């Protein structure tokens, strides 16, 4: 059974990528027999190069993606060096799951409603400046992409913090800090000169994922990014949506260019990391041993901004009349909720079906692969984890869409479900990898020595211990599925609509109230499942059940016996 699950995982995650790669390469060379293009050429590449603003879009993409990643990594390190192994770190860990639960699109809509020229932030400033008209400066769709950079950095910092948990525990940071402080280094100097050179290489894969996402993001860039020019990923997406199907080679060339761009930037980052850590090492030994780095209150800011979006979305969804610079709507109404209620039910049902199916299948695959690793000592190839997280979604899905067009029949629903499984699986696997590695195998070995079968030992001993992690990983898979925009749009071909696809399309419209309604519902669903997973994991904790079954004692003194129970 484990072998079958392992093979199925490799098949589902790798096999469809072959026709996808072939589809995008053939399209880029203008070979699309379905459209009557039977002579390969490079017209698509020439059309892409000749498009006005394509070079500026590439430059903007590199600037926003790289800057957002560097900002997120810097904030993550500053938070770690100030909060790790302190009383405040427990609060940081507790808030990570709710922060990760909020989808990027819902956060982007709330960010836009807060930092727009007539948003809540500028309304608050107007109370003191008495400005009667909205401000001209804004962080939403600004020409330099600063709003997009800030939003991406805020959203990706919790992910890097979560990935740092297992890394720092493996590094035994407490021992490193104790040894460094015995040599005269204070806390900040020890973190910068001793911990950082070891932490950064171990965080390479999560940083790659954040960097690739920042370079290729479409949905958040459509809401918060500049439009003249837009980022290159948004430009390729616009080319793909061109009603003239003969322009598909241009979009395919853009998808390949986006892939090459991501690969090039990741390679440059790897080179710079190598030089900083392994070649240019003077900064690790020279300089002052006592200095202080900021970061004490950074996590509060990272946590407050996303949760500030919830009341912003809530108020906007009920606002009927809200003139600038009023801090509160003059009239409230449920009109927009009533207007969209029927659509919301249908879209929420579609999102739930896709999320439940993809998260459950991804969870089964992840558990199967981890058990296969424990039993046969053969890990899942890193390529299976890396492809969905590091390669731009446009570059993968475009070719698969072309391949689907060449198949007889309707394959939109299975293809969409497959795409959701593909992109949810790495996050579910990574969420379970740490608990599986930390599980003490001697527990199941003891159960086997007492006569239980391997299956019964797993269900009765191991499952109760790892069940909280399984529930949280399942919630992570649901959250990832709820956030998928491009897989649903590309492979669903407009036949499958979800809360995310509708929220993105409405966010570019003029009615902020309807956008707030969809953004609020999209943020609410993952929070519900994360809350359910947290509550269920507490009840499923075996320590809780053991404590509940233990006999009650009247006083704490009964736990300490001064005399033996037998009579002398």
What is each PLM-predicted segment?
Residues 42, 55, 92-95, 176, ...:
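Amphipathic alpha-helical segments in well-structured domains
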Residues 171-174, 270-279, 439-442, 534-547:
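Membrane-interface capping segments at transmembrane-helix boundaries
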Residues 272-301:
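Flexible interhelical linker loops that connect adjacent transmembrane helices
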Residues 34, 38, 219-246, 325-330, ...:
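Glycine-rich helix-loop "coupling/hinge" segments at transmembrane-helix boundaries
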Residues 40-50, 332-341:
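A short amphipathic helical element positioned immediately N-terminal to and/or at the very start
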Residues 2-33, 49-169, 198, 202-219, ...:
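Membrane-water interface segments at the C-terminal ends of transmembrane alpha-helices
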Residues 181, 281-284, 448-450, 544-559:
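Short, highly charged, low-complexity non-transmembrane loops/tails of multi-pass membrane proteins
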Residues 86, 169-173, 178-199, 439, ...:
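Short helix-to-coil transition segments within interhelical loops
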